[in-house]
């Protein structure tokens, strides 16, 4: 079997206009090559090849957590920030390398040793697509179709009866939510195999029929979601109590702020886990607010929006909870 707490990168980059950007009508774009998921080249992470999802942080190499018969279908966030096309070329080596060295290495790898990790290459939309409700939505449909096709191929050729977890971030979460509403919720036999979903970095309402938000550290057949901001900060986009948030430190949806002592550490850009017990988190109006305890060079890392660090800030908490949450079924089966 087989994050990059890049807190020094200004998080607003994810939403800012970059040059070049697509300015033409979507219909004028030359159609991109459709991914062929029969080949490993179209999987940025796959159990049959070595990739960055197989790497543990440098100071966590003695980690002994292990599970089997679990698959994680991981949908990566936007890594297409510069370009003049609405959808990324699946053979763009620069974009694929960036995806591999960022989100696969610092997000998908949280499941290393605990699951088979499948992450498809797809014709992701340009970040500017989120600012264009016309062309962006059309480009989104192209990207989503790749995800749905990849998931169906995975089901038919790779799953082999394993338990399924869907994990995503940012643009990936938008596609994952649509995968639920358009496909999974229409196929009960498949939905029953999806034991957990990480819908991170985008607002997700608590209204996914038959698949609720998790509200307990050991809940399964539910989804986890959060968007991380500095305590007291309100973004200009969506926030409300109707948006589902699970605190990734105490794994509760509501209640008091998590204890500093419960925080296991942050995954930094140098690929090391550092500064355990350094933050407290609390759910507030559809947001996850964090407060940092003092640690060396803390001021350098302080931002209002921690979007790109949604996994990194809680990397070890996510990993340990995933193990505890998913081993429950194994223990139940041994008891029966």
Report each predicted region and the residues it spans.
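Loop/turn elements at helix/coil->beta-strand transitions in domains of secreted/extracellular proteins
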Residues: 68-70, 113-117, 160-163, 192-195
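Bacterial Sec-dependent N-terminal signal peptides
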Residues: 1-22
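Active-site catalytic motif of lipid deacylating hydrolases and related acyltransferases
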Residues: 22-28, 75-161, 295-309, 316, ...
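Flexible, membrane-associating and regulatory peripheral segments of lipid-active enzymes
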Residues: 17-100, 104
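Structural recognition of the beta-strand scaffold that forms the well-ordered cores
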Residues: 71-75, 118-121, 165-166, 196-199, ...
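Gly/Ala-rich beta-loop-alpha elbow adjacent to hydrolase catalytic centers
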Residues: 168-172, 176
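Surface cap/lid and interfacial helix-loop subdomains adjacent to catalytic sites
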Residues: 18-19, 148-160, 184-328, 332-336
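Short glycine-enriched nucleophile-adjacent loop
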Residues: 175-184
């Amino acid at each position: 079997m087989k994050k990059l707490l890049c807190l020094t990168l200004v998080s607003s980059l994810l939403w800012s206009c970059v040059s070049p950007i697509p300015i033409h009508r979507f219909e004028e774009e030359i159609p991109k090559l459709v991914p062929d998921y029969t080949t490993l080249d179209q999987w940025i992470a796959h159990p049959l090849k070595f990739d960055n999802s197989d790497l543990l942080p440098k100071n966590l190499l003695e980690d002994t957590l292990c599970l089997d018969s679990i698959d994680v279908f991981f949908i990566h966030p936007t890594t297409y920030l510069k370009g003049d096309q609405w959808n990324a070329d699946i053979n763009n080596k620069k974009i694929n390398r960036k995806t591999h060295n960022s989100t696969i290495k610092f997000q998908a790898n949280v499941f290393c040793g605990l699951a088979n990790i499948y992450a498809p290459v797809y014709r992701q939309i340009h970040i500017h697509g989120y600012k264009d409700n016309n062309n962006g939505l059309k480009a989104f449909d192209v990207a989503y179709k790749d995800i749905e096709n990849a998931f169906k191929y995975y089901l038919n050729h790779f799953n082999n009866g394993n338990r399924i977890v869907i994990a995503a971030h940012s643009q990936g979460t938008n596609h994952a939510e649509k995968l639920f509403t358009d496909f999974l919720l229409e196929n009960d036999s498949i939905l029953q195999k999806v034991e957990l979903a990480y819908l991170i970095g985008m607002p997700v309402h608590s209204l996914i029929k038959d698949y609720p938000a998790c509200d307990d550290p050991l809940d399964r057949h539910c989804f986890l979601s959060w968007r991380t901001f500095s305590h007291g900060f309100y973004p200009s986009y969506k926030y409300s109590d109707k948006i589902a948030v699970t605190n990734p430190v105490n794994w509760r949806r509501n209640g008091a702020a998590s204890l500093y002592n419960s925080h296991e550490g942050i995954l930094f850009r140098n690929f090391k886990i550092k500064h355990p017990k350094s933050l407290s988190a609390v759910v507030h109006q559809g947001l996850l607010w964090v407060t940092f305890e003092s640690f060396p060079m803390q001021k350098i890392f302080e931002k209002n929006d921690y979007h790109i660090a949604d996994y990194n800030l809680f990397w070890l908490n996510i990993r340990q909870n995933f193990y505890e949450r998913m081993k429950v079924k194994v223990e139940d089966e041994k008891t029966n």
